[in-house]
Each structure stands twice: as C-alpha cells, then as structure tokens.
Amino acid sequence: MPVTIKDVAKAAGVSPSTVTRVIQNKSTISDETKKRVRKAMKELNYHPNLNARSLVSSYTQVIGLVLPDDSDAFYQNPFFPSVLRGISQVASENHYAIQIATGKDEKERLNAISQMVYGKRVDGLIFLYAQEEDPLVKLVAEEQFPFLILGKSLSPFIPLVDNDNVQAGFDATEYFIKKGCKRIAFIGGSKKLFVTKDRLTGYEQALKHYKLTTDNNRIYFADEFLEEKGYKFSKRLFKHDPQIDAIITTDSLLAEGVCNYIAKHQLDVPVLSFDSVNPKLNLAAYVDINSLELGRVSLETILQIINDNKNNKQICYRQLIAHKIIEK
C-alpha cells in the first residue's frame, strides 16, 4: 500500500495537518518539527503530490531561474554549474524544484517569464545575470512578483546577491602590481553587464592608486564569454603593445583563449581570471568569488522573500559574498 500523510504523521509524532503544513513550508512550523517530519518522509519514502499540494497551498514549490541572453555560453561557462549546484543543494533541502527560463532572444525569454509569472508556475525567480534597463526585471518588479538578481542593481528596491566586484577588480590588479607588473591588460565581458563595469572600475582605480597609466588600447570587451574571443583579443593586445606584462580576464572561458594564445606564441606573461577555473589552465592566480555560496545564498534569500510575501512583509535583501585571490 502507498504511504500516506497519516503514516508520516504517526512516524513523526505529529498530526496529519502538521505534516501538510511542513510540506507547504509554512513559517509557523518550527525548524525542529520540520526536520522530524522530513526525516520521517525520507525514511518512509513518501513523496507528496506536487499538483495536489499546489492546489491546496496556492504555492508550487518551484523556483524559476532566468538565464542570460547567450545560453550557449551559459552551458559552457564553469561559473554557472557551480552556482546551480549551490542553488540545487538548498532547493533540495527545502523540497523545491527548479525550472529554467531561457530562449534564443529577449522576446522568447520574456515570453517564458510571462508564462511563469502569470501562469503561477513558480513561486519566485532568480536572475542569473545583471544588466542595465532589463525589460525582464522590469516586468517582474512591476508585478511585485518575488525575485532577486544574482549581481548588481542601481535600484535600491531590487533584492540581490553579489560580490564586491569593484574591490575584486582592484585586488586582482593590485596582485600584479605588487609582482612588479606595470603594463597590465584587461579583457572583460559585455559592457552592458554590471560585473564587467565594476571589475573594470576596480582595475582603473588600482592603476590610479599606484600611479600607473590607463591605456584604453589595453582594454577589450567581449560580447560573448567564449574561448575564441580571448584568443582574438590577445592577438590584438600584443600587436598594439608587445611589452604587456600581465593580463586580467573577467571570465574563465576568455582566460582559456588568452592562455592558448600565450602558449602558442611561447610568451612569458602571467594571466589572472575570475570564477571557477579549468585546473589545466596555466594561470598565475584567480579570484575565487565563491560561486557555490552565491548559489546557496541566492536560493535561501528567494525563499525568505517568498515567505515575507506570504506574511505581507517587504524587505529588500542585499547580500555580498566575500572573494579571495588564490595563487596557482
């Protein structure tokens, strides 16, 4: 016979209604009781009916993840699997499922999000990128639907989880300056992304602080995070200035292209990158932005926002995750 809520309640020493409230993740149930009920569910191999549960609670127990425009680069980039792992860990701990919103262009992604929001297919959204004047974020904010951004926002009313990317850019540049480098190049992602702008700002601030010249011919931006872009811009950099003595990239895929160019031309130029990196890359160091923790805190925060929404609370959460430079 299939296991029922009554069986779980008996095993956990609570009432069936308490089991139902635990399944609905109600804030009125203590963490200790939730833990006991979930342990009983696991031991009895009980799986609640998601559709029936959503009809009763009006909540789906699903979180939507909004991908950036370039989804191909998303799946190639080691940063995102690490973030997703953190998100999935917390989702699993809280009995939530994940649904991804993507599309080949902005119109398709807007349509996917509209279906999620107006169709009540998810309880909240996490945007896995941050850029200025995003119509997708505007739609969700206007509908007062629970969401947060993994990244930066200029609006003080948008919840977010991020690193201090200005400081991270400064620290990365300072690392090379303290090694004696003076002609440091910067290869970043799209200029419309806050993360690129902030890391560039930190780079420029460090050069200014140490009284080094900022040369715009040593700065390049890639519209896509792809290995070939890193290779292409490395070629341009060394053509302009063969004396470049260090390169900072804001992404591990760009770093791969840079390292390939340097290896092919037998150059002795150190490279530093951000995010999770391929251990095979010959980097001098990388900035560990703690992408796993970014994912975990993002999911924990959106669940708190959803819970606040249930209780008619309005709190704008803005959390920063620490970074550190790791030498290889």
Curated annotation (Swiss-Prot):
Region entry Dimerization, spans: 282-291
InterPro entries assigned: Cro/C1-type_HTH, HTH_LacI, Lambda_DNA-bd_dom_sf, Peripla_BP/Lac1_sug-bd_dom, Peripla_BP_I
Positions of the DNA-binding region: 5-24
Swiss-Prot/TrEMBL keywords: DNA-binding, Repressor, Transcription, Transcription regulation
Annotated PANTHER family: HTH-TYPE TRANSCRIPTIONAL REGULATOR GALS, LACI-RELATED TRANSCRIPTIONAL REPRESSOR
Role played: Transcriptional repressor of the maltosaccharide utilization operons malxCD and malMP.
Protein name per the record: HTH-type transcriptional regulator MalR
Organism: Streptococcus pneumoniae (strain ATCC BAA-255 / R6)
